[in-house]
Curated annotation (Swiss-Prot):
UniProt GO cellular component terms: plasma membrane
Native organism: Escherichia coli (strain K12)
GO biological process: glucose-6-phosphate transport; hexose phosphate transport; phosphate ion transmembrane transport
Membrane topology (UniProt): Multi-pass membrane protein
Effect on the protein of changing C108S: No change in activity
Ranges facing Cytoplasmic side: 1-24, 82-96, 142-159, 211-259, 319-326, 379-391, 447-463
Name of the featured protein: Hexose-6-phosphate:phosphate antiporter
Keyword annotations of the record: Cell inner membrane, Cell membrane, Membrane, Phosphate transport, Sugar transport, Transmembrane, Transmembrane helix, Transport
Localization, UniProt: Cell inner membrane
NCBIfam families for this protein: 2A0104, PRK09556.1
Quaternary structure note: Monomer.
């Protein structure tokens, strides 16, 4: 029934390596664009809820608590699905899996739209459909990581994944325009258009995405990426390919028993406290504590996203220049984050505030990308989805939740771990950044050992 999700592996074509390498580019770009545009589109049917909240309050009389319940449903299913759905996707055609999940998510959001009548809503159906949409979207990032990793050489992996990572920045930035266009021009200003129009776009993108590309050059008979680009197959891939390990055995051995993956999981929790803490509370801090105008506060939020866009592109490339030392590069960025948080906290005018938020966006999204890239370097390709998913689960269920609720309570004056007020909030951000540095430093050491070991193996092979 779902045969189109199965992997396709064709015998390697009897052609010279140079010819197969030239044939690689077109199917790679098709596959890359599918996961890039597909993941971007997922944000169009995710962030539209944030944009529509004020209209949902005025049109249907929903309370902040009710809106919070709807959002919480998405966060829980998204966090849980990061591991469950990504585990299922491993061993499947992950390029096909992403547009298929996009289609299912779009259908759910159409159901979400239908639960809003002309003058009344069904809160239960809204929570159910939005939660289901989150569950289906949860594997988008993991499928993208898996697909891109199978197509690209290790020495360029950070660059390709870094460029893909801007898809969510572009999707988040474009969500407002798409939602408002749907409401104002197609539904006479009614809030329901903010959900129906993006969902239709997502359906179209999803069905087109199913037609192009695949999850690996092996699907076209081109051989593995390592063979095409003259790289040694990783130790983890050699081990899983030379044995008849089941998917569960691979998951247990290379994910659950993998010390590096657990280090990255906890590092990701700390990083999400920093990232979401800044993202969630920057406008409130600027207005309440720094006494800046609401317009300047919003400008700072926008510059944080702009800095993230630039940083996402640059940090992956820098880690490639460092020969794949993702942990080391992440530690440098995290140290700079701590210094910049001090400037941001004590900003004496709007220009320092705006500059510090741009710098924080630039710096924070470096480690976020590099934690994911580091994870795929320590697992076989058959476990990339689950490895990326499990760190996402921890980040959303613990880091994201603490950043939104815990930091909010601290800023509001409620003591949490002895911290209170805005000074306590920034202390929590500093502690989280330091915790992330400590864990990433350990990862950097283990990464260095792995790089040197693989270099020695390659030298022996050449000799």
């Amino acid at each position: 029934m779902l045969a189109f999700l199965n992997q396709v592996r064709k015998p390697t074509l009897d052609l010279p390596l140079e010819v197969r390498r030239k044939m690689w580019f077109k199917p790679f770009m098709q596959s890359y664009l599918v996961v890039f545009i597909g993941y971007l589109t997922m944000y169009l049917i995710r962030k539209n809820f944030n944009i529509a909240q004020n209209d949902m309050i005025s049109t249907y009389g929903l309370s902040m608590t009710q809106l919070g319940m709807i959002g919480l449903g998405f966060s829980i299913t998204y966090g849980v699905g990061k591991t469950l759905v990504s585990y299922y996707a491993d061993g499947k055609n992950t390029k096909q899996f992403l547009p298929f999940m996009l289609i299912l998510s779009a259908i759910c959001m159409l159901g979400f739209s239908a639960s809003m009548g002309s003058g009344s809503v069904s809160l239960f159906l809204m929570i159910a459909f939005y939660a289901l949409s989150g569950f289906f979207q949860s594997t988008g990032g993991s499928c993208s990581y898996s697909t891109i990793t199978k197509w690209t050489p290790r020495r360029k992996r950070g660059t390709f994944l870094g460029f893909w990572n801007i898809s969510h920045n572009l999707g988040g930035a474009g969500a407002a325009g798409v939602a408002l266009f749907g409401a104002n021009y197609l539904f006479d200003g009614h809030v329901i258009g903010m959900f129906i129009f993006p969902s239709i776009i997502a359906l179209i993108v999803g069905f087109i995405g199913l037609r192009y590309g695949s999850d690996s050059p092996e699907s076209y008979g081109l051989g593995k990426a390592e063979e095409l680009f003259g790289e040694e197959i990783s130790e983890e891939d050699k081990e899983t390919e030379s044995t008849d390990m089941t998917k569960w055995q691979i998951f247990v051995e290379y994910v659950l028993k993998n010390k590096v993956i657990w280090l990255l999981c906890f590092a990701n929790i700390f990083l999400y406290v920093v990232r979401i803490g800044i993202d969630q509370w920057s406008t409130v801090y600027a207005f309440q504590e720094l006494k800046l105008s609401k317009a300047v506060a919003i400008q700072g939020f926008t510059l944080f996203e702009a800095g993230a866009l630039v940083g996402t592109l640059l940090w992956g490339w820098l880690s490639d220049l460092a020969n794949g030392r993702r942990g080391l590069v992440a530690c440098i960025a995290l140290a700079l984050i701590i210094a910049t948080l001090g400037v941001y906290q004590h900003a004496s005018n709007e220009y320092i505030y705006l500059a510090s938020l741009f710098a924080l966006g630039f710096l924070v999204f470096g480690p976020q990308l590099l934690i994911g890239v580091a994870a795929v370097g320590f697992v076989p390709k058959k476990a990339i989805g689950a490895a990326d998913g499990i760190k996402g689960t921890f980040a959303y269920l613990i880091g994201d939740s603490f950043a939104k609720l815990g930091l909010g309570m601290i800023a509001d004056g409620t003591p949490v771990f002895g911290l209170t007020g805005w000074a306590g909030t920034f202390a929590a951000l500093d502690i989280a950044a330091i915790g992330c540095i400590c864990l990433m430093a350990i990862v950097a050491v283990m990464e260095e050992r792995k790089i040197r070991r693989e270099k020695k193996i390659q030298q022996l092979t050449v000799a």
